[in-house]
């Protein structure tokens, strides 16, 4: 059993060398900011439903006999504004299914944010309690001694988690600070935790900065930078997106030491309430052990808020009030 525990530790260690990859990564991070920081839930004032589907390293084939192996992630989020008394709140719920070879993760998250309007900007605070269920198929792992795996199939473990964050915006500048994995969790599948290394959820701190520059009333440029650290390493994503008439957009991103991304999107309906986007990633570093292309689809539909203090404009042949 020592060999099995050692192999399990090596598997987790190799999967967490790039600490930012311990959680699902999305190329549309600039359009899905509440996933980065819970304080940004409905930060744009819109209740919405968001869907993301990501296929990473498309066409990757593992060296063992099992099919698949490339990461694939499905994401569903619902968020809305709430007005409880005088408290301007926002509520969001997220479901994520992430599959990576023999490992399958399911996340259920609940976000709560408080948006406070100030004289020179807006301050937002947010928390996100969540539950993670992690499944590992030991039958797909290769051991030096195959007898170590006899009788072992899929093992699962569930653990709570907590994220928190704050954001501040003034005019065209917004920045947000966040921290993930405030509750320590070790996914050891009932094995001796002293014999397994590299399987813990590492606490990660994040900074998200966004600026909007208007060339005209129809065209604006929106650069976004996301930096993450676990205090032993730093990774970053940089994106620049051009938006025309709030209707169509195009952009380019660079993910630290990994990939270049091209993004395209378009908003439909008269009020632009339905948005569809596509991201194409091309790996520029360490491409020998993976396929160089990834694809991601983005879909968002804006919904009316559950309750609102805004008085609707009612038009009749004689009155407008």
Regions found by a protein language model. Name each.
Residues 1-6, 19:
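Short, Lys/Arg-enriched, disordered terminal segments
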Residues 4-14:
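Sec-dependent N-terminal signal peptides
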Residues 9, 17, 317-319:
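Short non-domain terminal segments
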Residues 12-13, 17, 174:
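Hydrophobic core
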Residues 21-321:
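Subset of outer-membrane beta-barrel
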